[in-house]
Amino acid sequence: DIPIVNSILDDYYFNTRFSLNPLYWLYKLTYKKLIRKVLAHKGSAIYISDKIRDKYNDDMGLDGETIYLNSTVKRKLFAPVNTDNPSITYFGNIGMGRNHSLNDIGYALGRINPKYILEVYSGSKNPLEYGVFKDNPNVYYGGTIPYEQVQEKMQNSDVTVIVEGFLPKDIDESRYSLSTKAADVLASGVTILTYGS
């Protein structure tokens, strides 16, 4: 009887979508049953936000706490944004409509100055997610890079971007989420551009 500490960072348990596919509902039912079984064991839970904590604690009878993200990124000294050739970066998940928001930012940058490039780094292996950038001359998709390199590139950026999707399904899926890169961006002292609903 070793206690379990569950890390709950998203709303997958409660989040359902409309589907006529019986396999979706079979999966969802099996998933929920497994989660209830795991959460019935002695232990606790940690959450990424107070909203998701309250939802799970109330529904499951848990006594979990919100954890607050910290970062090991070194803070850079304040410097004005280099308007001639700014380093503009995004690090993280490009699913849930974030890719389309990043693409919007890329096109907006191109209208400001065709030389401005948004560098996007993500572990996405889904061509439907990163493929939206292929016709955008102001977005460079760099794929996966090690976390140490994320920290280094972030610290050397003029602007780092945090985005969310705008479609109702994207908003619904991320309503209890918090960008895990937010702590790094805030700690870095880099200028932050946020774009979301």
Residue ranges and their predicted role:
Residues 2-16:
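Active-site proximal beta-strand in glycosyltransferases
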Residues 3, 44, 117, 158, ...:
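Proline-centered loop/turn at the N-terminus of a beta-strand
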Residues 7-11, 68-71, 164-165:
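Histidine-centered beta-alpha loop that forms part of the nucleotide-sugar donor binding/catalytic region
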Residues 12, 25-45:
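Membrane-proximal helix-turn-helix segments that form the acceptor-binding/catalytic region
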Residues 40-41, 46-47, 52-72:
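Helix-loop-beta element that forms the nucleotide-linked donor phosphate-binding surface
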Residues 50-53, 122-128, 197:
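Short, polar loop motifs at secondary-structure junctions
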Residues 71-132, 140-150:
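Conserved catalytic-core segment of nucleotide-activated headgroup transferases in glycan assembly
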Residues 97-100, 148-152, 160-186, 192-197:
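Nucleotide-sugar-dependent
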